[in-house]
UniProtKB/Swiss-Prot annotation:
<keyword id="KW-0732">Signal</keyword>
<dbReference type="Pfam" id="PF13407">
    <property type="entry name" value="Peripla_BP_4"/>
</dbReference>
<comment type="function">
    <text>Binds to an autoinducer molecule. This complex then interacts with the LuxQ sensor protein.</text>
</comment>
<feature type="signal peptide">
    <location>
        <begin position="1"/>
        <end position="13"/>
    </location>
</feature>
<keyword id="KW-0574">Periplasm</keyword>
<dbReference type="GO" id="GO:0042597">
    <property type="term" value="C:periplasmic space"/>
</dbReference>
<comment type="similarity">
    <text>Belongs to the bacterial solute-binding protein 2 family.</text>
</comment>
<dbReference type="InterPro" id="IPR028082">
    <property type="entry name" value="Peripla_BP_I"/>
</dbReference>
<protein>
    <recommendedName>
        <fullName>Autoinducer 2-binding periplasmic protein LuxP</fullName>
    </recommendedName>
</protein>
<dbReference type="InterPro" id="IPR025997">
    <property type="entry name" value="SBP_2_dom"/>
</dbReference>
<dbReference type="GO" id="GO:0030246">
    <property type="term" value="F:carbohydrate binding"/>
</dbReference>
């Protein structure tokens, strides 16, 4: 397998998802809503989920040449989700004995728009068979629509599991990730258990865009079901640890009477933890989002109270299996969401270790 790496220094639990998710995310099908509206999609998604959880079965169809894959990821952040995801993808592709060439570009989230645009156009010019990208901003959406309208390259959209309604007749090859609404609702349910009498809270968003809407607004919407919980403040960040620190300080200086902070990403949560320590407010609970290595270390240290842990490698494996199905001429589902588990600092190290072995079953391999 030929691998081309461009390093850019520019940056199984199922939860009941509210029927109001599509109200929070206007213009998108909620994950479960989509599967219910299109029953055959539900069948295909469940079949792919089974394959993801099982051992790989090598490709039996002959390939006349390697397939070409381009990857543009916002991987330069403390969260190791993207790097692990790609590692799991490549290892599963190798286990499936698929011949491929891959071109990778990692950038910072919410930055390097010019670099992303250049990399994306290069992927199209090289006539990649598959392009793995994400959708968070309006700029991303315009590029994706260009690909859907004018290219034979098959588009895999990472970190989104809510199909765009306007693309109904020309959906991407695959939406894949861990459903943000599902994870956020699981965290909301846990906070309600932790504060049965109610609580005041603040929200630290990711940068403006889809992820903040899906994680932050869904959480607020869910907490609003009870009048015992009061949102005191909400701040957008720059999706970095430094901005999480600054936003947490600003929030607590203006609205000190809070019981917990809901953070929409790893980097934001870790920055907020530093602010809580500096201000002597470690009595305030705070969550992570994703349950990667940095968050699990913070939970072990007692700095992070809880997180929703993605079974991280599920999505990398799902992308590889979807490509295998495509090569074999099988119908691929439109959307796939991996599994979650809620983890708290009260959980035993043994329990967390078992979850890590499941979540990182490929990406922890040498």
């Amino acid at each position: 397998m030929k691998k081309i790496l461009l390093t850019c220094l520019l940056a199984s639990a199922s939860f009941q998802v509210s029927s109001h998710t599509s109200e929070v995310l206007s213009g998108y099908w909620a994950y479960q809503e989509f599967l219910e509206k299109f029953p055959q999609q539900g069948v295909l998604t469940r079949e792919l989920s089974e394959v993801v959880r099982n051992a790989p079965v090598p490709l039996k169809r002959h390939q006349s040449k390697p397939i070409r894959i381009s990857v543009v990821f916002p991987g330069q952040q403390i969260s190791d989700y993207w790097v692990r995801n790609l590692s799991a993808f490549e290892k599963r592709m190798d286990k499936l004995q698929i011949s491929y060439q891959i071109n990778q570009v990692f950038t910072r989230p919410n930055a390097d728009v010019k670099q992303q645009s250049v990399s994306l156009m290069e992927a199209l010019k090289s006539k990649s068979d598959y392009l793995i990208f994400t959708l968070d901003t309006t700029r991303h959406r315009k590029f994706i629509e260009h690909v859907l309208d004018s290219s034979e390259t098959k588009l895999i959209l990472q970190n989104i599991t809510t199909p765009v309604q306007a693309w109904d007749k020309r959906q991407p090859f695959l939406y894949v990730g861990f459903d943000h609404a599902e994870g956020s609702i699981a965290l909301a349910d846990k906070f309600k258990q932790l504060y049965p009498q109610g609580a005041n809270y603040s929200v630290l968003y990711f940068s403006e865009g889809y992820v903040s809407d899906a994680r932050g607004d869904t959480f607020i919407h869910q907490m609003n079901h009870s009048d015992r919980f009061a949102l005191k403040s909400s701040f957008y960040t720059k999706a970095t640890k430094a901005s999480g620190y600054e936003s947490a300080k600003n929030s607590l200086e203006r609205y000190p009477d809070v019981d917990f902070i809901y953070a929409c990403s790893t980097d934001v949560a870790l920055g907020a933890i530093d602010a809580l320590k500096e201000l002597g407010r470690t009595n305030i609970k705070i969550n992570g989002w994703g349950g990667g290595s940095a968050e699990l270390d913070a939970i072990a240290a007692g700095d992070l109270d809880l997180t929703v842990m993605r079974m991280n490698d599920d999505t990398g494996i799902a992308m590889a299996e979807a490509i295998k199905w495509d090569i074999e001429g099988r119908t691929v589902p439109t959307v796939f969401s991996g599994d979650f588990e809620v983890v708290t600092k009260e959980d035993s190290p043994e329990h967390i270790e078992l979850l890590k072995k499941r979540a990182f079953r490929y990406s922890d391999q040498p």
